[in-house]
Amino acid sequence: MSLSNKLSVKDLNVTGKRVFIRVDFNVPLDGKTITNNQRIVAALPTIKYVEEQKPKCIILASHLGRPNGERNEKYSLAPVAAELEKLLGQKVTFLDDCVGPEVTKAVDSATEGQIFLLENLRFHIEEEGSAKDKDGKKTKADPEAVKKFREQLTSLADVYVNDAFGTAHRAHSSMVGLEVPERAAGFLMSKELEYFAKALENPQRPFLAILGGAKVSDKIQLIDNLLDKVDMLIVGGGMAFTFKKVLNNMPIGDSLFDEAGAKNVENLVAKAKKNNVELILPVDFVTADKFDKDAEVSTADDVTGIPDKWMGLDCGPKSRKLFADAVAKAKTIVWNGPPGVFEFDKFAEGTKSLLDDAVKSAEVGNIVIIGGGDTATVAKKYGVVDKLSHVSTGGGASLELLEGKELPGVTALSNKA
């Protein structure tokens, strides 16, 4: 799956055509009020660009929340239609379903350039292919019904544009099931693919990956794949304690220890050695007597270790210097997972100083990519999203890319001729 060879919305001729755009309008709602419209704002460049090309109409489709394959007004996209109208400064026609005769009729009789927003795709079990009931029991969708649902979506479109990178790791009907001749990436999706291609397909070296997070077992595939690509690897966050205990028999007190992940540590270290990857682990820690923002604070290093009843919640000043030196050498940086419990101010210094180093690196022209999830939250919290090369919008999707997996929503896009 080449990331850099996918058709872009700019490669299309959409004049006079029905353009189906899969967007990610999965916004947080408080009742019917949108509490953060960032995802809607992020889709505007693609929508406006297509609109300028004078299409017959634009059909916007998204999911919202987890309605589990049935209609649930709590997850209606109606509030999104109102917000989108405000942001675009023009009428958006909200349709009460995403398939069916009413939808077909509305799209067929569209006036020039009309913008439609379909109701939540996940009101149909055929979008995800399965659903869970309230007891967590899974029901699979009938394959014939899925096929029909995909055909109904396809019948609305002459051209397909996907701008929902955050859902690209899901083989859902709206992501992979529209069989139209041209399937292109929108601007958001294109930017994600462009930056991940810069890191994973053709990185400027030295290439540094920074990994945080709690469990080694969650990141084994990620570490294993990156050890084939990077020159340096920082392992921080909670999972560093599993490495330190296994490799140096360091006492870790009540810090996180991942029994399952521990079995893989020596193999990963051996692979790093074999591939000449410099593995960088913290050497000192900021510790706490409990997992709490008001905890007592102390320090420890890897010579004496962390005493009983204490836990490491951040990396200490020597570790920060080690990490800063690695960042200063790197020309390409991918960062997934913070090195400390940044949600508590007393244990945020390691994350904040690493972020400052990353911003400095980006400012002198290096490629600095932040994977989605917690690390993206950190970049937002400290207001530096615009100072980094790229902050991914897709936590799960970016993680799977870094693990070396194919993303169904990307594979389904047309390649450039």
Swiss-Prot record:
It is an enzyme of class 2 (transferase). Its EC number is 2.7.2.3. It catalyses: (2R)-3-phosphoglycerate + ATP = (2R)-3-phospho-glyceroyl phosphate + ADP. Its cofactor is Mg(2+). ATP binds at residues 214, 219, 238, 312, 343, 374-375. InterPro entries: Phosphoglycerate_kinase, Phosphoglycerate_kinase_CS, Phosphoglycerate_kinase_N, Phosphoglycerate_kinase_sf. GO terms for biological process: gluconeogenesis; glycolytic process. ADP binds at residues 213, 237, 342. AMP binds at residues 214-215, 219, 238, 312, 343. It is found in: Cytoplasm; Mitochondrion. CDP binds at residues 213, 218, 237, 337, 342. Transmembrane segments: none annotated. Mg(2+) binds at residues 214, 218, 374. The keyword Nucleotide-binding applies. It comes from the Eukaryota. Pathway: Carbohydrate degradation; glycolysis; pyruvate from D-glyceraldehyde 3-phosphate: step 2/5. Keywords: ATP-binding, Cytoplasm, Glycolysis, Kinase, Magnesium, Metal-binding, Mitochondrion, Nucleotide-binding, Transferase. GO terms for molecular function: ADP binding; ATP binding; metal ion binding; phosphoglycerate kinase activity. CDD domains: Phosphoglycerate_kinase. One of its GO terms (cellular component) is mitochondrion. Pfam families: PGK. (2R)-3-phosphoglycerate binds at residues 23-26, 38-39, 62-63, 65-66, 121-122, 169-170. Monomer. Catalyzes one of the two ATP producing reactions in the glycolytic pathway via the reversible conversion of 1,3-diphosphoglycerate to 3-phosphoglycerate. Both L- and D- forms of purine and pyrimidine nucleotides can be used as substrates, but the activity is much lower on pyrimidines. Negatively regulates the biosynthesis of acetyl-CoA from pyruvate in the mitochondrion. Belongs to the phosphoglycerate kinase family. This is Phosphoglycerate kinase. It comes from Candida maltosa (Yeast).
